[in-house]
Amino acid sequence: MSQGQPRRPQQPAGQGENQEPIKYGDVFNVSGELANKPIAPQDAAMMQTAETQVLGQTQKGGTAAVMQAAATRNEQVGVVGHNDITDIAGEQGVTLAETDVAGRRIITEAVAGQVVGQYVQATPVMTSQVGVVLQNAITIGEALEATAKTAGDKPVDQSDAAAVQAAEVRATGSNVIIPGGLAATAQSAAAHNATLDRDEEKIKLNQVLTGATAKLPADKAVTRQDAEGVVSAELRNNPNVATHPGGVAASMAAAARLNENVNA
């Protein structure tokens, strides 16, 4: 199993010296209102329940464990109570979604709609009559299709379009943008969205990337170099110089890590 690891909260240097709460933004790549909220005990409890229901147990060093450690520390210094729940988490919920892509199970954890953790598991593989394990590497097209499910509701912006273009170039081996292809569609979507104010009216990633494999004229297994190229493109075109959790770059990076494990 591979996992996008959250940052484990640091213990204060001395007992009672640091009374500042550990906030979501301190340990997860989140933004907006959620980033400034302290992690509360009941938030962690909800994530533990979700992991147990879907994965059979909470994951060692995983999202629920990190949330529990942060919540325990916040309770110890008196900034939250044992039964407290963060208002935005209580209103919008904690979710754990499963997506099956090319024999892999992608598990995405979110708080208030923002991704805080992602796991990739290999599902049981087929074996041939002579007992050889057959396990195919994840392709660029499949990684893009995974993005349509893990971040499908995200409006397409210039960083997404740049990442999709970099992925298409890696898949086809050509720098020529294919008319009507994924990169061209993503660029058009980003340009269109830039003229709109309401997210509800904007073109979303799932509208561009669903069925990505069939839309690519060529495809290949994701390598670390492919992922690095896509990550670089997304970073360069994001004003905050950050990749989107569960987005194109994140899915490519997860696919590359899994492919390296398969080939190890």
UniProtKB/Swiss-Prot annotation:
<dbReference type="Pfam" id="PF04927">
    <property type="entry name" value="SMP"/>
</dbReference>
<protein>
    <recommendedName>
        <fullName>Late embryogenesis abundant protein D-34</fullName>
    </recommendedName>
</protein>
<dbReference type="InterPro" id="IPR042971">
    <property type="entry name" value="LEA_SMP"/>
</dbReference>
<feature type="region of interest" description="Disordered">
    <location>
        <begin position="1"/>
        <end position="23"/>
    </location>
</feature>
<keyword id="KW-0677">Repeat</keyword>
<comment type="function">
    <text>LEA proteins are late embryonic proteins abundant in higher plant seed embryos. There are two subsets of LEA proteins (5a and 5b), the first ones are expressed when the cotyledon weight reach 80 mg and the second set are expressed above 100 mg. The function of those proteins is not known.</text>
</comment>
<feature type="compositionally biased region" description="Low complexity">
    <location>
        <begin position="1"/>
        <end position="16"/>
    </location>
</feature>
<comment type="similarity">
    <text>Belongs to the LEA type SMP family.</text>
</comment>
<feature type="domain" description="SMP 1">
    <location>
        <begin position="22"/>
        <end position="76"/>
    </location>
</feature>
<dbReference type="InterPro" id="IPR007011">
    <property type="entry name" value="LEA_SMP_dom"/>
</dbReference>
<feature type="domain" description="SMP 2">
    <location>
        <begin position="138"/>
        <end position="194"/>
    </location>
</feature>
<feature type="domain" description="SMP 3">
    <location>
        <begin position="203"/>
        <end position="261"/>
    </location>
</feature>
